[in-house]
Amino acid sequence: MKRGLIIVCACLLIVSSFFSGCGTSDTQSTTEEVTQATEEQTTEATSEEVTETQEETTEEAEKASVSEESPVTYEYTQVDDSYFNDAVFIGDSISYGFELYVTEKRANGETVLGEAKFLTSGSLSYGNSLWDVSDESVHPTYNGVKMKLEDAIAQIKPGKIYILLGTNDVALYGVEQTIANADTEISRMLEASPGAEIFIMSTTPKYSPAESDVDGALNNADIDALNVAMWQFAVEKGYNFMNIAPLFKDETGGLAADYCSDKEGMGIHFTSAAYDIWLNFLYSYGKQQ
């Protein structure tokens, strides 16, 4: 098991390294790939930083801890399908693609992610998840009924809630408001299922050639800024953070071509090779019980 701790006073010095790309476009989805991709995110603290960290109290260090060698903020272990029996995955069209990927594997007789459920919808965001349900809203459906996330969570009562949102937030709302909306929505979900573990996954990158200089357009600089802020938010709130974004980056910091299914379009959606990596990551980084 790997575990590394770093505290808030060093956070600002390592975030650019922690959220940098892994520089891979290989399509194999082995544990070795995930290990290599995550190890490239490590950095060493200077003697001056160490001196500063020693001045922190143990309580502050634990509150601000984040793994330096690992892309997650908790003690982790390899898990099997049963671990996900009480899990629900929430997300936008990228996660909807993952739902289709898992559903196809299950239809072919594979046991994938146990009995995990999905609440996904195209264009879903932290922001619009707070809106009232209507014909125009993009809330996901559960048992055939469109409903707010917290209402679906109240019915499912999951023990683990995995969230991948932000792609449809950051360009529209900015980083600060996105974090505020995330705080509101996650609080509502926890009221609906007290005791559930929250796992926030970092927003995944955009294919660099698809980026635009137009004001208000989604770009990787804003995505990276959101991920740093979301990481800090998760640590402060006691939520689990999973930094999956670097697994899919190329040397430019954008979504690697082999992992992008819409290079001529939005440049944000995944190929099956990317979903292979994501699935393997989930099994490799279960939370130590």
Model-derived features: positions:
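Positively charged n-region of N-terminal signal peptides that target proteins for export
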Residues: 1-7
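N-terminal, intrinsically disordered, polar/charged segments of Gram-positive cell-envelope systems
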Residues: 24-86
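C-terminal motif of bacterial Sec signal peptides marking the signal peptidase cleavage site
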Residues: 18-21
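Catalytic His-Asp segment of secreted/periplasmic serine-dependent ester chemistry enzymes
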Residues: 206-289
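Conserved SGNH/GDSL esterase-like catalytic core that processes O-acyl groups on lipids
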Residues: 81-179
